[in-house]
Amino acid sequence: MKRAFLSALSVGLAALFLTGPAQAQGNPGPLRIEITEGVIEPLPIAVPPFLAETPAASQFARDIAQVVADDLEGSGLFRAIPENAFISPITSFDSPVQYADWKAINAQALVTGSVSVASDGRLVVKFRLFDVFSDAPLGKGLQFVASQSSWRRMGHKVADAVYSRITGEGGYFDSRVVFVSETGPKNARQKRLAIMDYDGANVQFLTDSSAIVLAPRFSPTGDRVLYTSYATGRPQITLLDVNSVRSQGLGSAQGGEMSFAPRFSPDGRSVVFSLTNGGNSDIYRRDLSSGAQTRLTATPAIETAPSFSPDGRQIVFESDRSGSQQLYVMSATGGEARRISFGPGRYGTPVWSPRGDLIAFTKQNQGRFHIGVMRTDGSEERLLTSSFLDESPTWSPNGRVIMFTRETSGAGGAPSLYSVDISGRNLRRVPTPGAASDPAWSPLLP
């Protein structure tokens, strides 16, 4: 079954890249990522240091180019050629490209750029992408302007544009991740919300450690975060403004003792969450403007972890109504739910892909935890990871990568954040200042 899946993956990805932008321009040798025996061969790409058009831009030029190279290589789809292999330096942003020199080091793509500091102090970043194989530019050059403090974002934006032009998919580099930062011993950890760039840079703390916080979730616009707070001594849903770092409780849930596992609807106007009353947990939906609350499930089972489909019409959630923890899908207005998980073991924390085609989940089976994906009808289940404890998956904005929490065994085991491609490749640890859990990936930043 694994071989069959890899074969199908090869065909799908090959079709994707062969119909990408390069072929659309009619080039004789389209820029693409080669796939052999179900394994993606990373595309060799050269990203020389960007040119500094003004002296004040010198360090920015080198650093921004490094962010671009790191982003692309970190995706697992590209291999950044080291600078010491370059034959000819880039001396002018507008000078003709010496394609033969880049072919000699087996580069298939080339990114050139320049950085200047405008009179108002802002950075101006220009870049161009070239198909070395076809001796031609790949699309038009682009320019980004932003404050100097946003230099890393400009690198991410360039990388997103390069990624998109070569793969035909949207990028995911100019995004952020909110997570739970943990300190202290395992049996008495202090938890606070933190936010960072997708690659672990620019960490900022959003709450102090006076109350336990869990399960942060971004709004569709990325400027608000829902999370569960124990500030009152019991779990309560709280809404935080990322820019002002101000938070407010959503008030006591109607008819319940505890509310947790919140998530925004795709339009940002309502939230779904679990509400516990008398030991029973059901799924509810609440309008953020009116406060009106609707019960979506009504069974004796424990039902939690709801997640909307991208079109807002359906909700996937976990329930033990069948006797074990499984995944179900129902209308966003409630009603009859259909079970979609039937494999061995227990399933939880389902999250709908932003593409709408897959659902990510946590699975426990035979003493191991896995992050997996399945079609929205439950078919084509694939396990991407396996460890002592993997949980809490969250999708990248383009639906290509999943970030999750991994914890090692033993008394001193601390959770960390990892990411993996939906093919199960490119498992990477995401750097954080300390222990970290419960990641939530933002949409692309505006």
UniProtKB/Swiss-Prot annotation:
Query: What is one Gene Ontology biological process annotated in the Swiss-Prot or TrEMBL record?
Result: protein import
Q: Where does it sit, as one GO cellular component term?
A: periplasmic space
- Where in the cell does this protein reside? Periplasm
The record ties this protein, via Pfam families, to:
PD40, TolB_N
Keywords from UniProt, A to Z, are: Cell cycle, Cell division, Periplasm, Signal
- The residues forming the signal peptide are 1-24
Under SUPFAM superfamilies, the record lists:
TolB, N-terminal domain (SSF52964), Tricorn protease N-terminal domain (SSF69304)
Respond yes or no to whether keyword Transferase is given for this record.
Answer: no
What does this chain do?
A: Part of the Tol-Pal system, which plays a role in outer membrane invagination during cell division and is important for maintaining outer membrane integrity.
Question: Assembly and partners?
Answer: The Tol-Pal system is composed of five core proteins: the inner membrane proteins TolA, TolQ and TolR, the periplasmic protein TolB and the outer membrane protein Pal. They form a network linking the inner and outer membranes and the peptidoglycan layer.
**The family this protein is said to belong to:** Belongs to the TolB family.
Q: Which PANTHER family would you find in this protein's record?
A: PROTEIN TOLB, PROTEIN TOLB HOMOLOG
Under which name does UniProt file this protein?
Tol-Pal system protein TolB
The scientific name of the source species is Dinoroseobacter shibae (strain DSM 16493 / NCIMB 14021 / DFL 12)
